[in-house]
């Protein structure tokens, strides 16, 4: 199956994102002395794909507030004191090359598929793995199969997987039923898996997990091979199908005040053209030439924010940047590193096929956990790591011991350790003796960003309805109710959860909730036409920002489905994080109604879930999304070993927020321990 060919719906993070030739990721962020602000202040993916990049783009045209001049191609030099070797180091990390500019992916693939190489005549080691996310679990499995004595130490008391987390019933964590329909599940974390990530694809195949296509772009309900492009763009009071926007961009662009040639160009096309100066430095290159190309990108733009690049290189005015930020999901990260958004934008591409694991991404965590389950110690949070007399000691506490009301403390000893805890979490771990200055600085300063999801359950997949199906469903509740909604004549919350399919799930919504919801509902108005789509993402400038339909493929035995009502990052996410979980759901439903119409409320079950990764005290944020300059100032010290201490996790790769980055780091660390 191939992804429908159409414009992309946004620039990603997470996932935790590029050609088949090499891995890629984005996958979900102050120069010295600079004021850290939204507009003055992007960490990467596989480079070969980006070298292929976007083609056919030309110099950015003049805009309302900028002259018709070519983009600048020679920004100011990097700040004094920047280590010149850092550019090459990071360039190789982007390309996943060794010090001789040879690809590392083939070696990593062999390890994933066949295990670590034989170690003739060398003693086995006792290895402590701190953290049971995908990096920790894979590293532990590889070392365990190679004959080493492995212990995995995990702070969470009931599950493994890190930011691979599925709201589901059962699983290794024995989760309670999260939704009214016992067959439903939804992703709190990683949800879309790029086919261009070779280690992940190989691992999934090896583990025998079933994939189905994740429709980043919506497809026809009756023919999933046919693109629909009927997803909504709802900004500045304009309601428009994406296909219509591509035919007539001016209708939305005018609302931002965009003039000149860009008035009639889509936000995606404007962004692609804006990134062309950077793409020219890497396009068509490989080996040492590719490394040199990436080093040039980093020297020219690595100390810049995305906003600075768009204004000073692409010469876009603020109105056009506002357009791009809103439609392409860049607004909340304009102040972060240009590098991150540059790489991310090239990965979220119509030519990239995305997949999801049938049954939930947590099935991957289950499969990684199974062979090392007896080696994993849950409910053991590392608080102190010592190196003494040739040994590593990890001091841990149970979660309840942190309240001062008892609990358990335990010390684990080994020859070496692989530490996969996010650096934001290591800020609260004591090292004795102290780590190197570069490592300590990275732990202190590495920027972690926020990401928040709000997921709502509905008893029917109303987004797939035709108008005829809407009419039948609504009139089954009350005669001519369909006409009332279409005319905007329903001005209270009386019909919240009113459809019989909600009651069949054992749900009856209280009148108090309906009265409360009336205050959140959008102002009465005629409902828009039926969405009639499967999968895809919708854009809004309301607090929800981006909306996706979970599990585009119908689930056997389930009539309803889950809507990712809000998927937001950075500042957008923090505005949701201020609310308690239960306070988010009616607000998110109102945001969905503003885009799709109020009638969807009749299928609302009020069985909802939400995940804030910044508030998660195991994750400490969505991912390391770096600030300008941090790739060359901090990253070279992130993955390096400190004696018997080795570091892994997606933050130690140039694929933060993506499982592929975690897997790359796991193999790297396991090989270091095994062959050292």
Where are these regions (language model features)?
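Conserved flavin/dinucleotide-binding core of flavoenzymes
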Residues: 71-114, 146, 391, 429, ...
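Mobile amphipathic helical/loop "lid" adjacent to a hydrophobic cofactor/ligand pocket
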Residues: 78-87, 98, 186, 205-206, ...
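Central beta-strand plus flanking loop segment that forms part of the substrate or channel wall
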Residues: 439-466
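Flavin (primarily FAD) binding-site architecture
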Residues: 419-436
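Active-site/ligand-binding neighborhood in enzyme catalytic cores
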Residues: 276-384, 400-403, 425-430, 451, ...
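N-terminal glycine-rich phosphate/pyrophosphate-binding loop and immediately adjacent elements
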Residues: 115-270
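Extreme N-terminal leader/targeting segments of oxidoreductases
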Residues: 2-126
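Core beta-strand elements of the Rossmann-like FAD/NAD(P) dinucleotide-binding domain
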Residues: 405-416
């Amino acid at each position: 199956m191939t992804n429908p060919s159409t414009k992309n719906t946004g620039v990603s993070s997470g996932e935790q994102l590029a050609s088949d030739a090499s891995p890629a990721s984005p996958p979900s962020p102050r120069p010295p002395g600079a004021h850290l602000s939204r507009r003055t202040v992007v960490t990467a993916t596989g480079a070969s794909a980006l070298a292929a990049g976007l083609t056919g783009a030309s110099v950015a045209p003049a805009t309302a507030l900028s002259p018709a001049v070519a983009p600048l191609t020679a920004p100011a030099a990097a700040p004094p004191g920047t280590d010149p070797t850092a550019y090459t180091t990071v360039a190789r990390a982007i390309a996943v090359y060794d010090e001789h500019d040879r690809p590392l992916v083939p070696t990593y693939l062999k390890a994933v598929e066949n295990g670590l190489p034989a170690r003739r005549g060398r003693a086995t080691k006792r290895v402590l793995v701190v953290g049971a996310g995908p990096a920790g679990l894979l590293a532990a499995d590889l070392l365990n199969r190679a004959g080493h004595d492995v212990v995995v130490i995990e702070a969470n008391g009931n599950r493994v997987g890190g930011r691979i987390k599925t709201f589901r019933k059962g699983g290794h964590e024995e989760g309670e039923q999260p939704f009214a329909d016992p067959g439903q599940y939804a992703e709190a974390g990683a949800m879309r898996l790029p086919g261009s990530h070779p280690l992940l694809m190989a691992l999934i195949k090896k583990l025998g997990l079933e994939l189905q296509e994740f429709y980043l772009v919506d497809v026809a309900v009756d023919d999933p091979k046919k693109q629909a492009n009927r997803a909504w763009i709802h900004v500045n009071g304009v309601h428009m199908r994406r296909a219509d926007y591509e035919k007539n961009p001016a209708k939305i662009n005018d609302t931002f005040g965009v003039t000149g040639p860009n008035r009639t160009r889509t936000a995606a096309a404007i962004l692609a053209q804006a990134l062309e100066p950077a793409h020219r430095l890497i396009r068509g290159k490989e080996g040492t030439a590719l490394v040199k190309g990436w080093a040039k990108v980093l020297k020219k733009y690595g100390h810049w924010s995305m906003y600075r690049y768009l204004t000073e290189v692409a010469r876009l005015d603020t109105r056009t940047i506002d357009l791009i930020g809103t439609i392409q999901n860049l607004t909340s990260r304009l102040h972060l590193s240009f590098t991150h958004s540059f790489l991310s934008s090239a990965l979220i591409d119509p030519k990239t096929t995305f997949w999801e694991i049938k049954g939930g991404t947590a099935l991957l965590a289950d499969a990684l956990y199974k062979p090392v389950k007896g080696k994993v110690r849950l409910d053991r949070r590392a608080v102190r790591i010592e190196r003494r007399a040739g040994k590593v000691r990890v001091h841990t506490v149970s979660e309840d011991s942190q309240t001062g009301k008892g609990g358990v403390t335990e010390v684990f000893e080994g020859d070496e350790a692989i530490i996969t805890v996010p650096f934001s979490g290591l800020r609260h771990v004591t090292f004795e003796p102290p780590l190197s200055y570069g490592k300590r600085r990275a732990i202190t300063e590495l920027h972690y960003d926020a990401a928040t999801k709000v997921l709502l359950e509905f008893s029917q997949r109303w987004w797939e309805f035709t108008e005829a199906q809407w009419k039948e469903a609504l009139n089954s509740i009350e005669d001519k109710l369909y006409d009332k909604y279409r005319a905007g004549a329903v001005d209270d919350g009386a019909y919240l959860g009113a459809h019989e399919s909600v009651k069949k799930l054992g749900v009856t919504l209280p009148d108090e909730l309906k009265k409360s919801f009336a205050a959140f509902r959008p102002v009465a108005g005629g409902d828009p036409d039926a969405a009639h789509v499967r999968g895809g993402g919708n854009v809004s400038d309301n607090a929800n920002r981006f909306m996706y339909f979970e599990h585009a493929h119908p689930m056997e035995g389930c009539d309803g489905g889950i809507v990712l009502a809000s998927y937001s990052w950075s500042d957008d996410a923090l505005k949701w994080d201020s609310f308690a979980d239960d306070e988010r759901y009616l607000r998110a439903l109102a945001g969905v109604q503003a885009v799709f119409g109020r009638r969807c409320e009749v299928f609302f079950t009020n069985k909802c879930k939400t995940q804030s990764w910044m508030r998660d005290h195991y994750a400490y944020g969505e991912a390391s999304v770096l600030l300008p300059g941090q790739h060359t100032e901090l990253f070279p010290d992130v993955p390096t070993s400190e004696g018997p201490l080795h570091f892994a996790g997606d933050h130690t790769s140039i694929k933060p927020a993506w499982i592929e980055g975690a897997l790359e780091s796991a193999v790297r660390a396991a090989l270091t321990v095994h062959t050292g």
